[in-house]
Structures are given as C-alpha cells and as structure tokens.
C-alpha cells in the first residue's frame, strides 16, 4: 500500500509537507512548484488520503466553479444568471469566485479549487497573466473554458467575442447618423483587459476608414481603478467622471461612445447635469444591451 512517506520520497519533500499540501492547508504557503511536485507524485503512485473514498464510490454533488471579476456589473450578473439556469437544469450547482480583479484573491480561489474537485470551471474573464500556466495545468484534468478574448499564449478553450467588430459597428452607427467628432470613454486599458483596447481599436479604425483620422477622442480611466474593490456604481461613476472631464476641458464632440452600457448611462447623467440634451445636443451609444439601458429615465 502506498503511504505518504512514499509520496514524500518521490517528491523530494518532507512527510509533513505532503500532508499539508494534499489536505489543502490554506494557512501555510508553498511554492507552486512544490505543490505540483507533491500532487504529481501522489497521482503517479495512486496515493489516497486516509479516509478518502475512491471518486467512483464518493457520490459528490455535481458542481461548476465560475470565476467572475465583479458581481457589481449588470453584464456579469446576467452572465452568471444564464450559467446558473443552465447548470441547475442539468443537476449542477454553481460556486462563484468573485475575484474583484484582485490577483491575490484569484490565487487563493485557485488553491481552494483543488480541494473542491469540481466537474468544470468557467472563467467569465481572462485569468491573471501570472496564473495562466496554473489555469492551463488545471484544464488538463478538469473541463475549463474562458468566456472572453483569451490571452494568445493560452491553450485553454475559450468562447471569444470579436471586440474589434463590436467597436466597428458602434462607430459605423454613429457615422451613419452623421457624427464626425466623437469621444470614446472606457475603463482602464490594461494588459489584462486588452479586449477593451480591441473595441477601441475597431471604433477608431472605422473612423479612419471614413477619412476621419484624429476625430476620435479616447478618454480612459486611470489604471488604479481596476485595483480598487469594485462598487455597485463603479462603471457608472467612471462614465460620469470621464464625461465631466471632456466637458471641462472643452473637447469638441457631438457623440459619446461608452465601452459598456453602465458607462454610457453615467455619460447621459453628466451631460444632463451640464444642461445638455440627449440626443438633441449630444448622442450617446453604449454596448451590452443590459436591462437598465431600456428603462425610461426618471429620478425616484
């Protein structure tokens, strides 16, 4: 019978380390290399922790883990509701890991998942670049999919959205309405959120194609925004603040494009507070088609 000392010898670590790694003691930190060596040795030797039944004998509840960057955005709430509805229909429970775009929190959840043994993992956003290899390793043993424009270096399955085309369609709509000088407001254009940049690029290129190079003002929020804990009104507030800054510095535009609907709603409020009429004075376009974008505006 294989024992923990056999695993320790094969992995080149102490028996205590084997015990803590395989029992997922989260108050003790081990390097990723050590964890992988121990888990690999245990798998190769067929070692099972005392008291743990064989997976075939152990009837666990079926569960899917979903990594989500925020639960304050209506877009992600709609996404989670859709995932949960389909999962429940098929007898699966859903465990949501709200990372709040915090790399340390994401790493903690990745460690916890090893003990959960879920039937599948869904990333509703790109994994943090530091953990791409860890996610790829996990995908070899657990079905895993990314709902986003995955990093080009990643080999994990993904449902990709053509954000360049999304940006192009937004620009084309404004051009068809006769707009020639416009502004595009967006959350931070960081490496991790490079799909945001794709949407901006598609938008700008369509204007350039129409012979209007230099007619698009890009106004992005500061990168520090993504490092703060998101609040319910984070994207709305960004849209409001960026629009105010455009108005205050005298920028010339007849339309504003928001990276998403919540930013566009913030833009509308900022314009109306400045006594500008929407769409008579300035047009506003968003993206996502969330429920709130169709509500007639009223102050409750």
What are these regions (language model features)?
Residues 1-60:
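N-terminal helix-turn-helix DNA-binding module of bacterial transcription factors
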């Amino acid at each position: 019978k294989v024992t923990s000392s056999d695993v320790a010898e094969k992995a080149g670590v102490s028996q205590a380390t084997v015990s803590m790694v395989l029992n997922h003691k989260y108050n003790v930190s081990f390097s990723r290399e050590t964890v992988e060596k121990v888990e690999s040795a245990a798998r190769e030797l067929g070692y099972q922790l005392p008291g743990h039944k064989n997976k075939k004998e152990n009837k666990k509840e079926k569960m899917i883990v979903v990594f989500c960057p925020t639960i304050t955005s209506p877009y992600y709430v709609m996404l989670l509701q859709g995932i949960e509805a389909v999962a429940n229909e098929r007898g699966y429970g859903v465990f949501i890991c709200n990372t709040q775009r915090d790399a340390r929190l994401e790493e903690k959840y990745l460690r916890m998942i090893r003990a959960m043994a879920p039937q599948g993992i869904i990333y509703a956003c790109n994994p943090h670049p530091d953990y791409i290899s860890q996610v790829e390793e996990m995908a070899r043993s657990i079905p895993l999919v990314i709902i986003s424009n995955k990093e080009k270096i990643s080999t994990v399955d993904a449902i990709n959205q053509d954000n360049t085309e999304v940006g192009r369609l937004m620009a084309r709509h404004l051009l068809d309405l006769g707009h020639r000088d416009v502004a595009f407001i967006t959350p931070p254009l960081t490496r991790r959120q490079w799909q945001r940049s794709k949407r901006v690029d598609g938008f700008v290129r369509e204007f350039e194609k129409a012979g209007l190079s230099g007619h698009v003002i890009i106004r992005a929020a500061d990168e520090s925004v993504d490092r703060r804990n998101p609040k319910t009104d984070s994207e709305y507030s960004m849209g409001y603040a960026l629009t105010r800054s455009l108005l205050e510095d005298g920028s010339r535009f007849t339309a504003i494009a928001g990276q998403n609907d919540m930013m566009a709603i913030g833009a509308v409020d900022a314009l109306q507070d400045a006594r500008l009429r929407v769409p008579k004075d300035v047009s506003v376009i968003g993206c996502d088609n969330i429920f709130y974008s169709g509500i007639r505006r009223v102050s409750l």
